[in-house]
UniProtKB/Swiss-Prot annotation:
Native source species: Lacticaseibacillus paracasei (strain ATCC 334 / BCRC 17002 / CCUG 31169 / CIP 107868 / KCTC 3260 / NRRL B-441)
GO cellular component terms attached to this protein's record: cytoplasm
SUPFAM superfamilies: Nucleotidylyl transferase
Highest taxon of the lineage: Bacteria
Enzyme class name: transferase
Cofactor: Mg(2+)
Protein's name in the database: Phosphopantetheine adenylyltransferase
Similarity comment: family membership: Belongs to the bacterial CoaD family.
Binding-site positions, ATP: S11, F12, H19, G91, I92, R93, E101, Y126, D127, A128, L129, S130, S131, T132
Residues the entry annotates as binding substrate: S11, K43, T76, R90
Catalytic activity: (R)-4'-phosphopantetheine + ATP + H(+) = 3'-dephospho-CoA + diphosphate
Amino acid sequence: MTKKIAVFPGSFDPFTNGHLDTVKRASRLFDEVVVAAMTNTSKKPLFSSEEKLALISESTAGLPNVKAMAAPKRLTVEFARSIGAQFMIRGIRNVADFGYEADIATVNHDLDPEIETVFLLADKQYDALSSTIIKEVAAFGGDVHRFVPAPVEAALYAKLGDAHQTK
């Protein structure tokens, strides 16, 4: 029987508890889950690819069938094909996410019909989380511990300044 390999692509800048929840759930569905740190050419990242990989690896250390990989600058579907993945995981927080992700899934299917996109609905507690909002909260000294895994929290404050400690 063929090993079921799924890719969970994203910029993960930073990796959030919502991302972690999606990875945990995907790890129960697939033999292997590759969390692919992608480059979003329309954004200036806070964390380097190496930092993202380290933070994702630390955050998913308890999940033996999960690994983090840096994806080269190319189409996600091409990356998935290159590692033998048959599935792409996408987390859906709301209707806006669904519309956007459905369009991308359609194009990806046109590019490679052998790779299926699987949507996982966000747990209600994570449906308002976004990396952009978390960076903003951290930059102004807000407490982000309930939004990100502990390694990410420490890295955020190290990057943005530890303003929340001075309150």
